[in-house]
């Protein structure tokens, strides 16, 4: 079957993308690794020995970066609806994060302890229709924030991919209520035409009793 013009243009952009070439050279599974590395360079989110949850982890670019930074004394729980090839010392939970059963598996993996950081690169399959895509994207963001509120230690941090659009302002307000400091990040490795940004919440205020 002949490729569409859109598909051809995507393939051309993909293979000409310097971050794709860097990922292949550096041994990372996706160009997304450089988004996290750039944020890490600026904000020093990830430190040795930390306990981290990585949502939307497949194919594993963020988990690779995080695993290397937290080292053998750290703990990383990764989850995605898609399969992900194993990474040493990473606990992977495959399933749909919108399902209660998958959330329960993540909480079981966390156990009675708390985590230092929740990161999420989740995004729904995009249809190109903002009226459809934004509610789906914001729903995933809300679920990730709810998980963060349940598992983070006081002072913990939260990093999530988010798209500007309907629901963003309300979500930003919710994060500000939960964290001492909230900032936006747009890594240079994020494609110019993409509306994605990363919202960073620092200093979890703790759960209200």
From Swiss-Prot:
<keyword id="KW-0489">Methyltransferase</keyword>
<feature type="binding site">
    <location>
        <position position="60"/>
    </location>
    <ligand>
        <name>S-adenosyl-L-methionine</name>
    </ligand>
</feature>
<feature type="compositionally biased region" description="Basic and acidic residues">
    <location>
        <begin position="182"/>
        <end position="196"/>
    </location>
</feature>
<keyword id="KW-0808">Transferase</keyword>
<dbReference type="GO" id="GO:0008650">
    <property type="term" value="F:rRNA (uridine-2'-O-)-methyltransferase activity"/>
</dbReference>
<feature type="binding site">
    <location>
        <position position="121"/>
    </location>
    <ligand>
        <name>S-adenosyl-L-methionine</name>
    </ligand>
</feature>
<feature type="active site" description="Proton acceptor">
    <location>
        <position position="161"/>
    </location>
</feature>
<dbReference type="InterPro" id="IPR002877">
    <property type="entry name" value="RNA_MeTrfase_FtsJ_dom"/>
</dbReference>
<keyword id="KW-0963">Cytoplasm</keyword>
<dbReference type="InterPro" id="IPR050082">
    <property type="entry name" value="RNA_methyltr_RlmE"/>
</dbReference>
<feature type="binding site">
    <location>
        <position position="62"/>
    </location>
    <ligand>
        <name>S-adenosyl-L-methionine</name>
    </ligand>
</feature>
<feature type="binding site">
    <location>
        <position position="80"/>
    </location>
    <ligand>
        <name>S-adenosyl-L-methionine</name>
    </ligand>
</feature>
<keyword id="KW-0949">S-adenosyl-L-methionine</keyword>
<feature type="binding site">
    <location>
        <position position="96"/>
    </location>
    <ligand>
        <name>S-adenosyl-L-methionine</name>
    </ligand>
</feature>
<dbReference type="InterPro" id="IPR029063">
    <property type="entry name" value="SAM-dependent_MTases_sf"/>
</dbReference>
<dbReference type="InterPro" id="IPR015507">
    <property type="entry name" value="rRNA-MeTfrase_E"/>
</dbReference>
<protein>
    <recommendedName>
        <fullName>Ribosomal RNA large subunit methyltransferase E</fullName>
        <ecNumber>2.1.1.166</ecNumber>
    </recommendedName>
</protein>
<feature type="region of interest" description="Disordered">
    <location>
        <begin position="182"/>
        <end position="209"/>
    </location>
</feature>
<keyword id="KW-0698">rRNA processing</keyword>
<comment type="similarity">
    <text>Belongs to the class I-like SAM-binding methyltransferase superfamily. RNA methyltransferase RlmE family.</text>
</comment>
<dbReference type="GO" id="GO:0005737">
    <property type="term" value="C:cytoplasm"/>
</dbReference>
<dbReference type="Pfam" id="PF01728">
    <property type="entry name" value="FtsJ"/>
</dbReference>
<comment type="function">
    <text>Specifically methylates the uridine in position 2552 of 23S rRNA at the 2'-O position of the ribose in the fully assembled 50S ribosomal subunit.</text>
</comment>
